[in-house]
């Protein structure tokens, strides 16, 4: 393909330069371009989850087949780890509960609990948890007192900068 031909031409130029000026950074640059190409070329295979068995989708929950859901992203994280990607970050938005805490917290924690639990189970069943570290964390916690109008269905909590959660598995 065109990308491969351009990369090969670039490799040839760098190799010629290295013959004249044998600097480590030139060889390093060649290796980095190759690694970037391999990573980009593997994206379609990694993101195609059509070959995942049904029991994996069942493990991760009802949103597992929905692209962009936390459950689908957890499956994608496992698939990236299988391809030896060294650092994978998942992000789950919507946790700034200054209001509607009872409804929002229940929904979001269900998504995260199911997805994270399934990811750890999946990694363990594949023997990958032995050399994979899962780190989950938030940048701040919540105060213990309510914020906003206090009703049974609509209240929130303010930020607590000295209280946060981090857990690890692996």
Model regions and ranges:
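Ligand-binding pockets and gating/stacking loops
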Residues: 1-170
């Amino acid at each position: 393909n065109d990308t491969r031909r351009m990369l090969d031409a670039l490799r040839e130029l760098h190799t010629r330069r290295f013959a004249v000026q044998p600097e480590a950074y030139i060889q390093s640059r060649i290796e980095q371009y190759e690694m970037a190409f391999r990573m980009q070329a593997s994206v379609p295979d990694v993101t195609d989850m059509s070959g995942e068995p049904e029991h994996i989708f069942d493990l991760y929950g009802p949103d597992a087949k929905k692209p962009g859901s936390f459950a689908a992203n957890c499956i994608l994280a496992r698939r990236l780890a299988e391809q030896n990607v060294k650092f994978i970050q998942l992000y789950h938005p919507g946790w700034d509960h200054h209001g509607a805490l009872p409804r929002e917290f229940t929904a979001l924690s269900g998504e995260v609990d199911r997805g994270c639990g399934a990811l750890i189970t999946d990694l363990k069943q594949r023997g990958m948890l032995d050399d994979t570290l899962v780190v989950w964390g938030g940048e701040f916690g919540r105060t213990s007192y309510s914020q906003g109008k206090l009703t049974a269905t609509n209240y929130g909590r303010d930020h607590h900068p000295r209280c946060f959660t981090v857990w690890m598995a692996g």
